[in-house]
Structures are given as C-alpha cells and as structure tokens.
Amino acid sequence: MALTNTSIRYGGVTKFFHWLTALLILTLIALGLYASDLPHDTQAALTRKAWLFSLHKTLGVTVFFVALARIVWAFTQPKPGLLNADHRLESWLAETVHWVLYGSLVIVPLAGWINHAAASGFAPIWWPLGQSLPFIPKNTTVEHAFGALHVISGKLLIGALILHIAGAVKHHVVDRDSTLRRMLPGEAVVGPLPAQHHSAAPVITATVVWVAAIAVGLGLGLGLGQQSDQPAPTETAALEDVASDWQVQDGTIALEVTQFGS
C-alpha cells in the first residue's frame, strides 16, 4: 500500500491519520459524557471525576496537534475524487460535512484548552506544556465563553460525525461502491470515477455553520460569565447590618488551599 494519495485512492498516511483521529474523537466523546454525569459529593468521587477530566483534556490536546498534522498532510496530497460526484446534492452534503469535521478537529479541542487555561485549579493537563496559554488570562468571563463554545462545537462535531458515518454506511450497504473500502487497509478496487465538479459551496457552507456556532457559543458563554462576575448585593448588605460587640485584639489566621490542578 502506497503512503501517498492518488487521484482515486487514499495512501497509508492519510488512512493512519483518519483512523487515529476517529479513535481519539470517539474516546473523547465517551469520556466527556461519562465524566460530566459523575457525582462529586465525596472526596473520592471528586478525585475520580477530576482524573477522568484530566485524561479527557490531555487527549483533547493530543487531538489538536494530530489534527494540525493531518490538515497539513491533506494540503500536500491530491484528494481522491468522489465516487458519487454525479449526484450533486449528495456530494455537496458529503463535502460540507467533511469541512465541518475538519473545523471541529481544531475548534473543539482549542476551545476546551482555552477554557482550561482561563480557569483555576481543576483537572490538570498531563502534557508538560503548563496549564496556561499565552495571552489567555485567568478570568471567569473567558472561561465561561470558551467553555460554552466547547460544548456547542462539541455537539456540532457529534452531529457531523453521525452524518459522516451514516454516509459511509449508505455507500457500503446501499450504493455498494468502494467509498468505505478505500479508507480501509489494503488496495480497494475502484472503477472509473464520474466527472468531478469542483465548487467552493461546501467550504462556504461549512464556514457559515462554524461562524454561527462560534457566535452562539461565545454569546451564551459571555452572558454566563458576566452573571457569575456580579457580586451578590443582598448577602453583602446582610453582613454589613450585623451588630456585634466582638473586637479582635491580637491573633493570626492560617489558611491553606490545596487545588487539584493549576
């Protein structure tokens, strides 16, 4: 099996990136959903939850760098033609989902990484890169904004992944062509390709989808961040109104905080 792509087949490197990314993404989705639903009412439960989130974050950073390498490789390779290029609507949808997935591989882990860098003290990333990012302050507004973007873009990733898998199954079961087989190990037998129709429409559509998702995610997160930054005036007023004859003459107070993370 050749390492590089041709006009009709995917090479070994592209297949490796494809299946490595698929394994990481499916693992991350399962980890994120499972860890989010775990209780944290005891110290043992909190430690377990934090450990799973550390694993989730560490694999997420891994996906980010794998995605960058995959995208760079893809731009150096010819893209095999579509086997259903003569079905304009279907090929447009397939290409749009393809570009949405590429965006997901960068935006979802990056949003999560920025959310982590802006937060304090929970579930560290295990890569030796530190827990902060340049130009990202420890700030609850930034934390909430990119946390919401991570959730919204993650849902978009799951939706695009479902469509991608459904399309592959349709090609294999209904159309009975080599779309799925040529991404598997070995050399798939591929017949003559139909005439290819190159268009910017899928890229434009995917860009519009991502602009909308980013706007919604950041908008929701900024609203949550501003609410959390506001003090509780009723509690402050209640404390100020408390009358007491106590006076501090002399003494010291020691406070030690241990955080699991940055």
Q: Where does each model-flagged region fall?
A:
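Membrane-embedded alpha-helical bundles that constitute the cytochrome b-like, heme-associated redox core
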Residues: 1-237
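A glycine-anchored, Pro-Gly-centered beta-turn/N-cap motif
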Residues: 242-245
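N-terminal glycine/threonine-rich, aromatic-flanked beta-hairpin/loop signature
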Residues: 248-262
